[in-house]
Amino acid sequence: MEAELTIVIPAKNEAEMLPRLLKSLCLQDYEGMDATRVIVADAGSTDGTVELALSFRDQLAIEVIPGGLPSVGRNAGAKLATTKYVLFLDADVELPEPTLLRRALWRMRRRNLHLATTNIACREGSFFDDALYAGNNLMQYIGSFLKPFATGMFMLFDRRAFWALGGFNERALFAEDYLLSKGVARTRFRIVRGKVLTTNRRFQKLGHGRMVWMFFKTMMHSWDDGYFLRDQGYWGEAEV
């Protein structure tokens, strides 16, 4: 089967979490998985992330390239892609359902979509963690009728549409995924049934209240692209 998908994963010091994601990719029932290029854009990891990624070479067509902030790493990987579709995943997620990739790609083809995403759930999270991700999923659903909203945890793009939008804004210091997804036409966006699992480390480092406030401000500034180019303190506090 000719490759139609490239997967791009920005990473920095993800030796603990990245293997979960890569193992879940190995378990996907998508028939083109063997031909799918998996690109890890590493931002100078010092914990063995690169070595762990390359240890999957006998199971995945995986390679490591230089990265940076997520937007830089994602664009770097996308520039190497020649396939029709590019899937961006965060390094700390995993795909618990082996059918997710197959179903997402089927939806992209059938509806001629530019972007597809899915729901988010917290792995072993607290009530508040689950509530915040449920709120994210709700806003994502509402956005599907108004202005598309997707996070970098799972963004499946038509590659040409991705570059027509300019790719991820590398000057953006906050919510670069939202800044990009809101440019997608509503009729070319869908939420695929299912979910990815992620951690609660964002909430642990910034606090639930701070994350809610930042999310609220993002929604309030959805028409102001300049807001996303100003330092909101996210990476300075959230970076591990």
Show which residues each predicted segment covers.
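Glycine-rich, basic loop-to-helix element that forms the pyrophosphate-binding segment
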Residues: I65-A81
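Short aromatic/hydrophobic "clamp" motif used to bind/position activated sugar donors
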Residues: V86
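A conserved acidic beta->alpha catalytic loop
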Residues: D42-V50, V93-E94
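Short beta-strand/loop segment that forms part of the nucleotide-sugar
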Residues: D34-G44, I65-G67
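Acidic donor-binding loop at a coil-to-helix junction in glycosyltransferase catalytic cores
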Residues: L173-L180
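Short, acidic, metal-binding catalytic loop of nucleotide-sugar glycosyltransferases
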Residues: S24-D34
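A recurrent flexible, glycine/aromatic-enriched loop bordering the glycosyltransferase active site
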Residues: L115, I120-F127, L138-F157
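Conserved donor NDP-sugar-binding/catalytic core segment of glycosyltransferases
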Residues: P98-F128
